[in-house]
Amino acid sequence: MGVMDGLWRWLGVEREEVREEIIELPAYSEENQRGPTNVVSIHSNKTFKVVVCEPESFDEVQVLADHLKSRKQLILNFDNTPPEVSQRIIDFISGTTYSLEGHSQQLGKNIFIFTPSNVEIAKDHRSLMRKHGFANPFGGEK
């Protein structure tokens, strides 16, 4: 589980049963613009939320789907969920993600990320982790 702990730290998320985190992006400021330039500021006042959840039953899928509809990212950990329940939840949330034109990817054996359409997932996560120093932190298999 050491590699996943590194991934969680890289994502800036501490492992908890359910955790919502607000990431504040810096707002545009006139003070940042000194003199005439051709640079256009792309900062916005939007906040993005990441919901980390360890679902225990299929009854939670509506709440999870509502998070996606609200444009929140979901990280689902199925380590303590029965396999048949996990598969049903993954199927439901995958359908929700598809209908919202979102994205999904498996991060680990039982860990998945689902994002709304405004958030893309880098497909080559291993090279990103190597770039940021998180690949193979404990000397295990590459």
UniProtKB/Swiss-Prot annotation:
Coiled-coil region(s): none
Gene Ontology terms describing biological process: division septum assembly; FtsZ-dependent cytokinesis
Subunit structure: Homodimer. Interacts with FtsZ.
Assigned GO CC terms: cytoplasm
UniProt entry keywords in alphabetical sequence: Cell cycle, Cell division, Cytoplasm, Septation
Biological role stated in the UniProt entry: Cell division protein that is part of the divisome complex and is recruited early to the Z-ring. Probably stimulates Z-ring formation, perhaps through the cross-linking of FtsZ protofilaments. Its function overlaps with FtsA.
The keyword Calcium belongs to this UniProt entry's keyword annotation: no
Protein name per Swiss-Prot or TrEMBL: Cell division protein SepF
Record InterPro entries: Cell_div_SepF, Cell_div_SepF/SepF-rel, SepF-like_sf
Source species: Syntrophomonas wolfei subsp. wolfei (strain DSM 2245B / Goettingen)
Localisation: Cytoplasm
Family that this chain belongs to: Belongs to the SepF family.
